[in-house]
């Protein structure tokens, strides 16, 4: 449904503090709703606190209400709001429905005049020290790896943030990021220049190299989140370095995520053939795939990062349909970028769909994790 421009938000509180910190970048939170009289008198997190009775007397057309409570209480509050005349998904939202990315993204643009992107993936270097048979970045296919210097990377970052106001995730990936000499410099640049517009600055490492002390110091100081892949089951030579990496991250107090998965899915580009699909079938295939990742490279945003990786590896030819060119900034074109981020490409799909088995749930080709090419 359409979202009315400039509607302020009120948060029905319980988990409200967490939600407040997540969405305060929008700049249009107008307060909390709570029965607590002390909060009503003193405010909360610097915002006004409104009594529920005031909201329930009549529909407040100046605000939308986000219900941020545990399930049973949230359902009760939503019933009261609907009885009072509020319309679910227009005037009031469960927290999980509001944060559903398409709703959140469109609200940010049309109500708060802010452009956000679900995530950003950047690969300054494709160099990797593993040869995974089903690598989603197609590293084994590269005849010559691509390495961008810091000047190139910095330009891409600065260009992106001319266009967008916020992203929940910015991940500097690879290849193996620890083989990139400018990894620390890139992470520090993101934190020092754009931290107020990025919720989580991340990197992902494969456990084959123990990060150095200086990099660990920087990652701790600049609040970098590390995703640590766990390939020990199928690459046993990583067991020692994996353990040492965990110890190092713990020693420096770095936030890290155990990125273990029991199986991979294969994009299976060598055996997938969808060229007989009609345009409509390919559009539906692209929509059902639903890959949420956006890749940034050479001042371009790619709607499917796997299509971009495949083009870099020489598997397919890249076309203008695959990306949005960020070089020539225009306020008017921000609406075009929003549409592109919502996966509206010129064709309605990317040509790589014809050779790809799809992302995650759409893909039934399960394979061993990090199985190495001999």
Predicted feature locations:
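Short, polar loop motifs at secondary-structure junctions
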Residues: 33-39, 208
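Phosphate-bearing ligand-interacting subdomains
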Residues: 37-106
């Amino acid at each position: 449904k359409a979202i009315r421009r400039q509607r302020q938000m009120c948060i029905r509180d319980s988990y409200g503090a967490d939600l407040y910190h997540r969405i305060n970048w929008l700049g249009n939170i107008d307060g909390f709703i709570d029965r607590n009289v002390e909060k009503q008198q003193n405010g909360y997190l610097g915002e006004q606190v409104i009594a529920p009775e005031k909201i329930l007397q009549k529909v407040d057309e100046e605000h939308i209400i986000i219900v941020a409570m545990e399930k049973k209480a949230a359902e009760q509050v939503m019933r009261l709001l609907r009885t009072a005349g509020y319309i679910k998904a227009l005037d009031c939202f469960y927290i999980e429905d509001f944060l559903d990315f398409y709703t959140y993204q469109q609200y940010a643009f049309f109500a708060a005049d802010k452009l956000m992107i679900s995530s950003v993936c950047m690969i300054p270097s494709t160099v990797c020290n593993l040869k995974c048979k089903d690598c989603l970045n197609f590293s084994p296919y590269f005849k010559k790896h691509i390495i961008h210097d810091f000047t190139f990377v910095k330009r891409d970052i600065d260009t992106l943030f001319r266009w967008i106001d916020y992203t929940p995730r910015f991940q500097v990936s690879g290849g193996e990021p620890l083989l990139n000499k400018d990894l620390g410099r890139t992470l520090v640049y993101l934190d020092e220049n754009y931290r107020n517009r990025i919720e989580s600055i991340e990197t992902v490492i494969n456990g084959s190299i123990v990060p150095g002390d200086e990099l660990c110091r920087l990652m701790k100081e600049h609040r970098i989140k590390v995703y640590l892949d766990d390939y020990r089951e199928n690459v046993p030579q990583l067991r020692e370095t994996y353990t040492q990496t965990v110890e190092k991250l713990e020693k420096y107090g770095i936030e890290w995520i155990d990125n273990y998965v029991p199986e991979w899915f294969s994009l299976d580009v060598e055996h997938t053939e969808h060229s007989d699909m009609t345009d409509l079938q390919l559009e539906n295939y692209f929509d059902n795939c639903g890959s949420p990742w956006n890749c940034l490279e050479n001042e371009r945003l790619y709607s499917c990062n796997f299509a971009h990786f495949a083009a870099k590896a020489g598997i397919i030819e890249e076309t203008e349909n695959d990306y949005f060119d960020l070089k020539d900034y225009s306020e008017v074109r921000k609406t075009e970028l929003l549409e592109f981020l919502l996966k509206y490409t010129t064709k309605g799909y990317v040509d790589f769909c014809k050779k790809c088995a799809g992302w995650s749930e759409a893909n039934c080709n399960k394979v061993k994790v990090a199985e190495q090419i001999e």
